[in-house]
Amino acid sequence: MLFEGLELVSALATLAACLVSVTLLLAVSQQLWQLRWAATRDKSCKLPIPKGSMGFPLIGETGHWLLQGSGFQSSRREKYGNVFKTHLLGRPLIRVTGAENVRKILLGEHQLVSTEWPRSARVLLGPNTVANSIGDIHRNKRKVFSKIFSHEALESYLPKIQLVIQDTLRAWSSQPEAINVYQEAQRLTFRMAVRVLLGFSIPEEDLGHLFEVYQQFVENVFSLPVDLPFSGYRRGIQARQILQKGLEKAIREKLQCTQGKDYSDALDILIESSKEHGKEMTMQELKDGTLELIFAAYATTASASTSLIMQLLKHPAVLEKLREELRAQGLLHGGGCPCEGTLRLDTLSSLRYLDCVIKEVMRLFTPVSGGYRTVLQTFELDGFQIPKGWSVMYSIRDTHDTAPVFKDVNVFDPDRFSQARSEDKDGRFHYLPFGGGVRTCLGKHLAKLFLKVLAVELASTSRFELATRTFPRITLVPVLHPVDGLSVKFFGLDSNQNEILPETEAMLSATV
């Protein structure tokens, strides 16, 4: 017994020594990691590097960021201020909040900073995209892509978008059980991007498979760039390869069949616009371009659509006021009239309260956290040096949350954007859901168009209620969305705003 007791004590002592050694090793390595990045400061500049933590060697604070969500940024902003350093997704990063700070970054494109997304996003989106291009190449690509989102192009997309949304809402209302709004909004925006924006005639079964693959792709766009089996980065690369094959097949089939079209879709415009600028696009450029267009129309719009539905659920008075505006304009048509072409761009533009609702959703629930830049030359920001070679992320969501121009910043209040109040009129960099400067989101008008049509159709054709006891928590990666997807039961409404019986709803859905 004595020897057994001594052996146990010896084992515990060995374990304790190992734990102490590991703890000391972690502490020393973490300290060396902090010093390694502190040494990169520009010694010709007397200003200090921003305060903050670089986390653990190699992984930095990526784990904290993924687990804490919005709390990561807010806790560090409270501790270190509006400009702080961290290490995310395999690289050192300075995060920036506040209108004046963001203004300097956005207006400093090509002089102080240049765009550079995290490595995972650069690889997965591809080298031929607008997002990954810089300088003259970026300017030329924007000219080519801008025609896709012109007023004329949006007017041609509108009837098709309205029909896709009407079709989807009837399908939601015909379901006997609640639906997962975020997941179904992803299906809706993916269908809109593929069918309407790109004009692909992909069979329904193949479209469903592509959607599943695309979800895997989007979920890993922002991942630790470590190419190992079963890593998120590897899954993203595999998804990209499958998507590229599917897109090439769809593009080739589309180029061979130009008969029977009643409008020019984005791919038609993209090919024609590139020819006008003296360049014939290669197949790889077309594949990267279509992948980027789907990405732009899919993830962020699905996020905003889900946020819109959640806020209309939380604020029935807002929904009723929206219905009153539609009723006054003769647009409260009900689900019994699946008519194409009842909306026009000028009609949507005249709906002032609708515009306020969409703006407020985008203020409080901006789908993306911000934008990434690489520092071209050391400059000063908020009393700190931003060293050449470092990465900077300007924070859209936190700039909205801390903007002094907005009263009761955490309250959902569409009237803050009314003509009487116009809280966003003082300083354009307090409100920037679509970024700013030379890299303002090209598809912002399409996104707003989609959200407005969705709001009109929701108010006109649907009653909806939360299927859970409480509203879900929100997570931010890869874009803002409810952790459970938001479970909601939908019911169809007729032209008199009376609920449509399930049998009638099923008949309407079957005719689409």
From Swiss-Prot:
E.C. no: 1.14.13.-
InterPro entries, sorted: Cyt_P450 (IPR001128), Cyt_P450_CS (IPR017972), Cyt_P450_E_grp-IV (IPR002403), Cyt_P450_sf (IPR036396)
Cysteines engaged in disulfide bonds, as pairs: none
GO BP term, pick one: cell fate determination
Cell compartment(s), UniProt: Endoplasmic reticulum membrane; Microsome membrane
Keywords assigned by UniProt, alphabetized: Endoplasmic reticulum, Heme, Iron, Lipid metabolism, Membrane, Metal-binding, Microsome, Monooxygenase, Oxidoreductase
Phenotype upon gene inactivation: Germ cells enter meiosis precociously in embryonic testes, due to strong-up-regulation of Stra8.
Its job: A cytochrome P450 monooxygenase involved in the metabolism of retinoates (RAs), the active metabolites of vitamin A, and critical signaling molecules in animals. RAs exist as at least four different isomers: all-trans-RA (atRA), 9-cis-RA, 13-cis-RA, and 9,13-dicis-RA, where atRA is considered to be the biologically active isomer, although 9-cis-RA and 13-cis-RA also have activity.
Name of the protein this chain belongs to: Cytochrome P450 26B1
Organism: Mus musculus
The organism's taxonomic lineage, starting at the top: Eukaryota, Metazoa, Chordata, Craniata, Vertebrata
Name of the gene this protein is made from: Cyp26b1
